[in-house]
């Protein structure tokens, strides 16, 4: 993936920035020569009356209405709690979460799908195997990690190498 040197973080979409302003910001971002847009399924779960997915939904509407999907390197994340047991990096939850994100984003693939947090309760072999399945199915182009410690990232990279499966290609540290 070839990304611009800066990513536009979509955390604000759907709570501090409304849909119309979000569309204008995304248009300006692309017009300025940038291409990398980052969001997460959990944005903006914490706002009263929200259920998560609001940012992805706005980005999806913008992608569909603008026709600019081919110009965007789209990143999203999963794994933080969205309530009702929707949390973690189990293979079953990864499969469920990617389908929900694809639907909200109104696209058939995600360029960079990231683990938003480590999940110590799920073996890395299982998590990375599920991500590998998504890459092979064409639903995800690459995978990344967010909020991982250096030792845990190293362990994940070792697992991927040992098993010959998709590996974390990026690290997004805590803001």
Where do the protein language model's features map onto the residues?
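Flexible, active-site-adjacent loop/turn segments at secondary-structure boundaries
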Residues: 1-4, 11, 40-41, 76, ...
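Conserved catalytic core of Hanks-type protein kinase domains
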Residues: 29, 77, 104
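Acidic active-site catalytic centers that drive phospho-/nucleotidyl reactions
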Residues: 38, 56, 77, 111, ...
